[in-house]
Amino acid sequence: VVAPILHGKNGEDGTIQGLLELAAIPYVGCGVLASAACMDKAVANTIMDAYHVPHCHWCSAVRAEAETQRSTLLTRVENRLPYPIFVKPANAGSSVGITKAHNREELNTAIDTALREDDKVVFEEFIDGQEVECAAIGNPDNPQEVRTTRPGEILAGAEFYTYDDKYKN
């Protein structure tokens, strides 16, 4: 049995899970579809919207729009979300490529930062409050049984929980 304890592209996006399934190798964790859907922040937000799960306001753009219609994109994002705005690559983990933009100039630069990691960019509203994390662990033999870990508070060293906060500090 494989425990795919991997981060980021190819590790938690369904790629390794799909490879393991093709090779008929049992593994623990989420399957291909759940992994892929949760790795892509735009897809995950769309699913949460469809099921009326409360979460931050958001919008997204693809590289072509960001490169050919930048001014229109900036205006669309500003009309949808108040500053500060989190700008994220849709398919990256560990806070890689994430920027907290406080104005139009920072928003413009943040789009370029996110595009270095992915071809799709997600924009999310900033929500001021306590941030906690908790894992939910399902049981495939009994889908009604779900256990959770104890919640832990995230204490960011900077304005948000950065890569350095997660792995270096």
Description of each model-found segment:
Residues 5, 9, 33-37, 99, ...:
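Glycine- and other small-residue-rich loops at beta-strand/loop junctions that grip anionic moieties
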Residues 2-5, 28-30, 57, 122-124:
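Short catalytic-loop micro-motif centered on adjacent basic/acidic residues
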Residues 1-7, 13-16:
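Contiguous, glycine/small-aliphatic-enriched amphipathic segments in soluble metabolic enzymes
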Residues 1, 80-81, 117:
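Glycine-rich phosphate-binding loop signature in dinucleotide/nucleotide-binding domains
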Residues 102-169:
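Phosphate-binding site of ATP-dependent enzymes
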Residues 6-8, 58, 89-90, 126:
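Fold-independent oxyanion-binding glycine-rich loops
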Residues 13, 17, 21-97:
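A conserved helix-loop-beta module that forms one wall/lid of the active-site cleft
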